[in-house]
């Protein structure tokens, strides 16, 4: 090919002249050229590479125009017809423009170049956009009918599958031979690619149905009946099959044609959408299979557009339905297929527009595409390249509005690009979501962003709140952020760790997260809007999916490019290929005929590859061969050698003109005949020379005649062209004159308006300056006054705060001094510190700080002495705020009225109520005092009527067991009762031991069975179960061992919000369920009172000594013995000076004592009497053996006490009733009357001994005292018998055993 110097266009992949596929000049893309203006005309889109030759499906073997070689071996080395070549012709050079206008004048010569093959990476497979006619191969049709008949006739599923499997191998080989499918194991050039078309007329291929029947992968939706084993032919849908690496390509019988795919999707919409949400996975797979079949056939026609659009709508509907339901599904997979469908639609829309067609629903799905990547700024740039009618569409503008409203500069996510137009108008977003004009499917798509929009909305609100701001009510969040209910708000707040106040408000200041995605945490479940759900209920799924305009019925889809535009270079090349092929075929018919090469320097100056033709001509390939030869000087025969230069110039003028040149049929035939005659004359024999010369002469004359006619036509055309030039010149002059006058008037008017505007602006400037200056001075004056006022107010407030701080500091200093003195006093008394162990290591004591372990210095007063936070109950703050909690109880109506009914009405019975607490100064104990209408712990309340008399008494560790004779109810406070508790379990264990000690004293003195109410103050941090509390307090042991004196045990856990109500209910329950019973001591006292009443003892003026005196004597005796015993141990113990430290330790009861201090093995095999006598140095004679230490025999004689002793002859009775005890329980038979009243009564040894002591004291008289056993050294003012001492030691051993258990 001959080209001019510097005019060859480089064949690169850089599309310098490639524009955007847009046919409209819109305001949105006015600066962007629609197509390559160099190589395209009439605003049509070029190929994907401007230098690529277009290929058509009608003819595969096409060869572009190229220069024929001078060598006769050209026919052997000619280029392959199936390949594509780069175009560097004169037309392209003329459009681009050469570097030099006429290189020949400068001595340059044209060089011939071989056509370069088009690179493979520039070859594109054009999709089919027009509707395709369905054509099925007869053999394939017969084969599918045979497969269907076999499916109906064979019932065995395995046999059917094997039969069809064998037929499939034959089918593949025949399809490969027919060229309907590519071979499985052979590589194939892209030039030889086939146009694949599916031929399956069912919604699921026959072979796949058979295979799935064997594999048991048929869904219930694909069967006629749920119990069927075979898939129904009318209901089965083809599954998606992921292509394997080495798998064979699908057969035509496995792929459904476009009209069957439309039918399949219609079936899904009409019959399966109502089965959602259970069928979500099934529909997801079947819709993906539909899109896969379109891809197999490389089909982008109307059916593909319709199916992909409806698939997008179905995915949007599924997103809403699945979020609304509780069925688990993969949101990521649904969004992935939705995005892929939108990308496929965008590519089809671009291809259709480049071909001159339109799609009626493009704007709707362009809007969905904008929402698919709602924070990607690249989509904003792409949408501006679309035509105006799409960019200005209502749906596209609405999608752009949502993109702007949702944009948020605080959004943090990997790959997110922050832009300058981030609005975060979350309130406007939720207003638009409630608008009825919002399309329903678009609303479903936007619902996917509800969680992050709500999160960043609350985060923005949290930045606007100060520390004193109240929590945001739930009703405000529900209305502003469209939460469906309060439960949804609570779940949202709990997920993002937002504190909820009183169950109806959220403290946004506690929001600490910066992103809506929490690391290592499952995402929050997607939610939906009820306003959209209500709109969905008013429509049907089918109507929602099939909405929009029908693509299949659209009259305008793809326009014919041949009718609407002038053919481009690629089309011209295609025409030249057809002509060149025809010429080569005719040239090869006679290999001996060779054209004569003209070596004359005079050549026709026509441009190669320029073939003017009529736009309306439909027979484009039929171009004159003579004209084709004249365009190429290498192929021009001698017959044109005598044309004058003027004729050449005229031909060049015609060639360069804009009007088409039309060849008539006669000229074309004559030229062809002349060419044939000339070629024959070069090879024929001499006999024909004369005949041929005459024919040539005639042809020459005809040619000259034709040229004369052409000259006439050219002359007329030249005249018309001259007229056109003159007309244009006159029109240009008129336009210039009119434009000049108009411009002058416009400029004058603009100048006057500009001057007026300038004067107006100057006047306004002066006035505004004065106004602003006055306003500024006024603001400065007001600021000065405000500053003065503020300073005075601050000084006043500062002084007040200073005075208050001084007073408080003074009080704290006084209190600190007082506490220091108390600690110092206690340290001197106990010898150990009274606070917790320090968490830091103190320095080694030196001479200056000997007492540093017992006193707090000023430098150590801020140290924390415990690694564990102190326990505090839940009501420490709650009790101080609600006044009704402190209101005293109405004990008469709540408790005493019901209790009176339980006591006998024939006498007045005392029934006292004791409240126990270690420290009555704590808040919880003060609350108890307030509820029982007591001011201090020393106060008491009385109640009496004709039946009972009661007193409410408060006790602590310092109590007298003898006061419990008339106890009816014991209230025991435990748990977090003090603010300085650091180990709750240890506290409960100590309280349990104290409770056992207290109940032991009560059991020895009470006359009636009492109720035990334990008030447990729950810890706010360490919550214990009820079973744990009972175990720590040893309630099970208490209920077992003291069942004879305890009527019932109740545990009240104050964990509710209304403790006063809980206390009222518990007291009322105890009063209703109480059963009046006498204890063994009560029964015994009652019997004695009856006996004494019969004997007249009650009439004496001098009453007998009560058991209280004995108790006091026994107590003093125990203290004396204990001190004496401790003194003796201290004399022998080297470590005695450390016992005070051991006793003061809070864990002394829980750890093992050293062997040196342990006394557990000192008297392991001694009786209590022997142990006592060994420690006493004043004893001279062994005491009598204890009658309680003897084991009770089975046939022991029971001393009868039925006969009452006369009062006049009191005597000391040595016949003490026999007592038996087993473990901790004892059984006493006092008399035959007691045996009849209660046959088997189990009581503790302490109770028995107490009654015996009481018996002995009552039966004695002052005249006849008991002879002491001890010697005179132990006889003082308090004469205590040895039997009593022995009994007390035995009681102590039993108590110790009970406590150890």
UniProtKB/Swiss-Prot annotation:
It is found in: Nucleus envelope. The modification Phosphoserine is found at residues 568, 866. Pfam families: SAC3, SAC3_GANP. PROSITE patterns: PCI. One of its GO terms (molecular function) is molecular adaptor activity. Keywords: Acetylation, mRNA transport, Nucleus, Phosphoprotein, Transcription, Transcription regulation, Transport. Residues 333-524 form the PCI domain. Residues 733-860 are annotated as: Interaction with CDC31. Residues 573-1301 are annotated as: Required for targeting SAC3 to the nuclear pore. Residues 54-82, 689-715, 1164-1185 are annotated as: Disordered. GO terms for biological process: actin filament-based process; mitotic cell cycle; mRNA 3'-end processing; mRNA export from nucleus; nuclear mRNA surveillance; positive regulation of transcription by RNA polymerase II; post-transcriptional tethering of RNA polymerase II gene DNA at nuclear periphery; protein export from nucleus. Its main location: nucleus. The modification N6-acetyllysine is found at residue 748. It comes from the Eukaryota. Residues 54-76 have a biased composition (Polar residues). One of its GO terms (cellular component) is transcription export complex 2. Present with 339 molecules/cell in log phase SD medium. Belongs to the SAC3 family. Component of the SAC3-THP1 complex, which functions in transcription-coupled mRNA export from the nucleus to the cytoplasm. SAC3-THP1 functions in docking export-competent ribonucleoprotein particles (mRNPs) to the nuclear entrance of the nuclear pore complex (nuclear basket), by association with components of the nuclear mRNA export machinery (MEX67-MTR2 and SUB2) in the nucleoplasm and the nucleoporin NUP1 at the nuclear basket. This is Nuclear mRNA export protein SAC3. The lineage of its organism: Eukaryota, Fungi, Dikarya, Ascomycota, Saccharomycotina.
């Amino acid at each position: 090919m001959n080209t001019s110097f510097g005019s060859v266009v480089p064949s690169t992949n850089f599309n310098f002249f490639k524009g955007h596929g847009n046919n409209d000049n819109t305001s949105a893309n006015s600066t962007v050229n629609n197509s390559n203006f160099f190589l395209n005309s009439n605003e049509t889109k070029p190929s994907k590479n401007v230098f690529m030759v277009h290929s058509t499906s009608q003819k595969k073997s096409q060869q572009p125009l190229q220069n024929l070689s001078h060598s006769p071996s050209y026919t052997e080395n000619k280029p392959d017809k199936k390949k594509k070549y780069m175009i560097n012709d004169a037309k392209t050079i003329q459009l681009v423009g050469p570097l030099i206008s006429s290189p020949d004048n400068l001595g340059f010569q044209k060089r011939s170049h071989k056509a370069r093959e088009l690179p493979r990476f520039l070859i594109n497979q054009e999709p089919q956009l027009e509707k395709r006619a369905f054509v099925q191969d007869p053999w394939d049709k017969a084969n599918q009918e045979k497969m269907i008949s076999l499916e109906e006739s064979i019932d065995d599923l395995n046999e059917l599958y094997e039969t069809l499997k064998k037929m499939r191998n034959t089918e593949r080989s025949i399809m490969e031979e027919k060229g309907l499918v590519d071979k499985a194991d052979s590589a194939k050039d892209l030039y030889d690619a086939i146009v694949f078309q599916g031929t399956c007329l069912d919604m699921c291929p026959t072979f796949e149905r058979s295979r799935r029947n064997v594999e048991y992968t048929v869904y219930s939706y694909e069967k006629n009946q749920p119990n069927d084993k075979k898939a129904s032919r009318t209901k089965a849908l083809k599954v998606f099959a992921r292509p394997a690496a080495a798998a064979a390509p699908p057969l035509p019988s496995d792929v459904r044609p476009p009209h069957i795919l439309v039918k399949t999707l219609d079936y899904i919409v009409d019959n399966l959408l109502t089965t959602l949400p259970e069928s979500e996975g099934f529909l997801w797979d079947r819709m993906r299979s539909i899109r896969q079949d379109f891809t197999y056939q490389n089909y982008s026609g109307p059916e593909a557009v319709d199916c992909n659009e409806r698939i997008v709508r179905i995915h949007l509907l599924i997103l809403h339905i699945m979020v609304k339901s509780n069925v688990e599904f993969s949101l990521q997979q649904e969004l992935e297929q939705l995005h892929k469908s939108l990308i496929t639609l965008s590519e089809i829309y671009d291809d259709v527009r480049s071909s001159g067609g339109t799609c009626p629903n493009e704007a709707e799905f362009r809007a969905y595409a904008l929402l698919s990547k709602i924070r990607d700024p690249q989509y904003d740039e792409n949408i501006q390249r679309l035509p105006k009618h799409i960019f200005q569409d209502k749906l596209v503008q609405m999608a752009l509005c949502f993109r702007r409203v949702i944009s948020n500069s605080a959004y943090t996510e990997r790959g997110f690009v922050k832009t300058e137009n981030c609005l975060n108008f979350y309130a406007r977003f939720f207003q638009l979501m409630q608008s009825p004009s919002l399309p329903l499917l678009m609303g479903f798509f936007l619902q996917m962003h509800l969680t992050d929009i709500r999160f960043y909305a609350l985060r923005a609100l949290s930045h606007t709140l100060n520390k004193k701001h109240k929590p945001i009510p739930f009703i405000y969040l529900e209305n502003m952020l469209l939460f469906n209910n309060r439960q949804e708000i609570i779940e949202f707040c709990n997920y993002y760790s937002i504190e909820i106040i009183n169950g109806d408000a959220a403290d946004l200041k506690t929001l600490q997260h910066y992103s809506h995605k929490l690391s290592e945490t499952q995402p929050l479940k997607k939610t939906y809007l009820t306003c959209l759900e209500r709109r969905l209920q008013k429509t049907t799924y089918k109507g929602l999916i099939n909405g929009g305009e029908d693509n299949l019925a659209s009259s305008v889809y793809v326009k014919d490019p041949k009718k609407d535009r002038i053919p481009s270079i690629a089309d011209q090349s295609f025409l030249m290929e057809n002509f060149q092929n025809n010429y080569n075929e005719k040239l090869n018919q006679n290999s001996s005929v060779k054209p004569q090469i003209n070596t004359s320097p005079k050549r026709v100056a026509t441009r190669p590859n320029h073939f003017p033709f009529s736009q309306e001509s439909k027979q484009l390939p039929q171009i004159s061969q003579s004209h084709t030869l004249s365009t190429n000087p290498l192929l021009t025969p001698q017959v044109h050698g005598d044309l004058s230069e003027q004729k050449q110039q005229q031909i060049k003028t015609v060639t360069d003109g804009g009007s088409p040149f039309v060849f008539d049929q006669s000229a074309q035939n004559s030229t062809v005949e002349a060419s044939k005659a000339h070629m024959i004359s070069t090879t024929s024999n001499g006999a024909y020379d004369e005949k041929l010369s005459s024919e040539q002469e005639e042809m020459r004359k005809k040619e000259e005649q034709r040229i004369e006619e052409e000259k006439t036509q050219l002359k007329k055309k030249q005249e018309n062209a001259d007229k056109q030039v003159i007309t244009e010149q006159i029109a240009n002059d008129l336009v210039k004159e009119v434009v000049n006058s108009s411009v002058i008037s416009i400029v004058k008017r603009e100048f006057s308006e500009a001057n007026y505007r300038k004067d107006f602006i100057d006047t306004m400037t002066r006035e505004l300056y004065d106004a602003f200056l006055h306003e500024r001075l006024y603001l400065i004056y007001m600021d000065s006054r405000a500053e003065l006022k503020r300073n005075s107010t601050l000084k006043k407030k500062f002084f007040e705060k200073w005075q208050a701080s001084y007073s408080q500091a003074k009080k704290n200093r006084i209190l600190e001094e007082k506490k220091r003195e108390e600690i110092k006093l206690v340290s001197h008394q106990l010898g150990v510190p009274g606070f917790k162990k320090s968490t830091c290591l103190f320095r080694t004591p030196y001479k200056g700080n000997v007492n540093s372990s017992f006193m707090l210095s000023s430098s150590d007063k801020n140290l924390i002495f415990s690694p564990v936070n102190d326990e505090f109950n839940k009501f420490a703050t709650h009790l101080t705020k609600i006044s009704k909690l402190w209101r005293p109880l109405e004990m008469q109506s709540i408790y005493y009225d019901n209790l009176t009914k339980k006591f006998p009405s024939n006498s007045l019975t005392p029934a006292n109520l004791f409240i126990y607490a270690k420290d009555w100064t704590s808040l919880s104990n003060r609350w108890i005092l307030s509820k029982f209408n007591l001011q201090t712990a020393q106060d008491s309340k009385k109640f009496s009527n004709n039946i009972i008399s009661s007193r409410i008494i408060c006790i602590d560790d310092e109590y007298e067991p003898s006061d419990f004779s008339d106890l009816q109810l014991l209230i025991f406070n435990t748990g977090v009762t003090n603010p300085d508790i650091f180990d709750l379990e240890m506290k409960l264990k100590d309280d349990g031991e104290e409770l056992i000690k207290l109940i032991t004293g009560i059991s020895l003195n009470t006359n009636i069975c009492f109720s035990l109410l334990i008030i447990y103050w729950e810890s706010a941090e360490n919550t214990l179960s009820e079973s744990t509390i009972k175990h720590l307090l040893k309630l099970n042991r208490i209920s077992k061992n003291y069942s004879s004196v305890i009527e019932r045990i109740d545990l009240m856990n104050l964990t509710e919000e209304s403790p006063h109500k809980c206390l009222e209910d518990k007291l009322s329950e105890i009063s209703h369920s109480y059963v009046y019973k006498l204890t063994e001591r009560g029964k015994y006292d009652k019997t004695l009172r009856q006996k004494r009443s019969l004997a007249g003892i009650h009439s004496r003026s001098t009453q007998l000594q009560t058991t209280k005196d004995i108790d006091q004597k026994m107590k003093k005796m125990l203290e004396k013995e204990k001190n004496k015993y401790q003194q003796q141990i201290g004399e022998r113990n080297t470590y005695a000076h450390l016992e005070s430290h051991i006793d003061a330790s809070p864990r002394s009861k829980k750890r093992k004592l050293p062997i040196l201090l342990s006394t557990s093995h000192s008297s392991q095999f001694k009786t209590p009497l022997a142990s006592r006598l060994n420690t006493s140095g004043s004893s001279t004679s062994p005491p009598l053996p204890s009658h309680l230490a003897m084991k009770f025999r089975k046939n022991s004689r029971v001393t009868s006490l039925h006969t009452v002793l006369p009062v006049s002859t009191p005597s000391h009775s040595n016949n003490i009733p026999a007592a038996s005890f087993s473990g901790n329980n004892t059984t006493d038979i006092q008399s035959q009357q007691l045996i009849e009243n209660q046959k088997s009564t189990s009581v503790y040894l302490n109770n028995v001994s107490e009654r015996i002591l009481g018996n002995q004291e009552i039966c004695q008289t002052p005249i006849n005292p008991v002879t002491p056993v001890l010697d005179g050294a132990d006889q003082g003012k308090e004469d205590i018998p040895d039997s009593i001492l022995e009994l007390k030691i035995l009681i102590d051993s039993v108590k110790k055993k009970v406590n150890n258990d």
